A protein has these predicted regions:
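NTP-dependent nucleotidyl-transfer catalytic core
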Residues: 1-249
Length: 249
């Protein structure tokens, strides 16, 4: 959650809501879950962007990251923090400050998303945070990696941990843990899907944007390797283009 919902998101929401209503009307135990990617570099950029605008509010300089966020909502949130907390964060510990701005940014951006979804009458029963899988020293993620290792699905190479995904339909093996100890995007995603299955769900439908189409095979190969070959279906939703007088807007 690094910004407002746009028309592309609205299309995804409408599609998912229709599928959910059909399943519910057919008597299925359907559960609607919104996955919140709040543990990656984008959230670091969100925090740094907010800090930059917060400093700007007080006439101070703090570099806006090259890959940061420039929209008006970032300025608005930074101003909210300044009005609430005053200038206490100008000289705060950098790590503590970043953590606070990340957390606050995610909370406020997600609140807007939740409010918009309510206006669409698109209700979710759970907002599943990615950071959940990093709690308790990444216990759920580590349990998942241990299970994969015990099943002979991983190997070490160049200091990194790899998944033998080519043995399960992928075009190349995938990194699970990088040589610096950080995780690839795939690893918490595998843990998330296993967590769904552990809660008793035997049919998973994911709605992803078209920019994630190459991700489908690697996720399906991971679940196949773990013994769940037919559990996941992924619908790819193309982006919406808004056109006015023949021109894209």
């Amino acid at each position: 959650p690094t910004g407002d919902l746009h028309c592309g998101h609205a299309r995804n929401a409408a599609w998912g809501d229709c599928i959910s209503r059909l399943y519910e009307a057919s008597g299925y135990n359907n559960y609607r879950e919104f996955y919140v990617n709040d543990a990656g570099n984008q959230i670091v950029m969100l925090g740094e962007s907010l800090i930059s605008r917060y400093f700007e509010h007080f006439g101070k300089e703090y570099p806006l990251p090259e890959d940061g966020y420039h929209a008006q909502d970032i300025i608005d949130i930074a101003n909210q923090i300044a009005e609430k907390d005053g200038d206490k964060w100008l000289n705060a510990d950098p790590a503590e400050r970043l953590e606070y701005f990340k957390k606050t940014g995610v909370e406020l951006e997600l609140k807007k998303i939740e409010d918009d979804l309510k206006l669409y009458r698109c209700d979710f029963q759970n907002f599943q945070h990615e950071t959940f899988f990093y709690e308790n020293n990444r216990k759920r993620i580590n349990d998942c990696l241990t299970k994969m290792a015990d099943m002979g699905l991983t190997y070490e190479k160049d200091g990194a941990l790899w998944f033998k995904s080519t043995e399960y339909g992928d075009d190349k093996d995938r990194v699970l843990r990088k040589s610096d100890g950080t995780l690839s995007y795939l690893t918490p995603d595998i843990a998330n899907h296993i967590y769904k299955i552990e809660r008793g769900y035997d049919h998973l439908i994911n709605l992803w944007g078209a920019d994630h189409h190459s991700y489908v095979t690697r996720m399906q190969s991971a679940l196949t390797a773990l013994g769940y070959p037919d559990v996941l279906k992924v619908d790819i939703i193309q982006m919406v283009r808004m056109v006015e007088d023949g021109k894209e807007v």
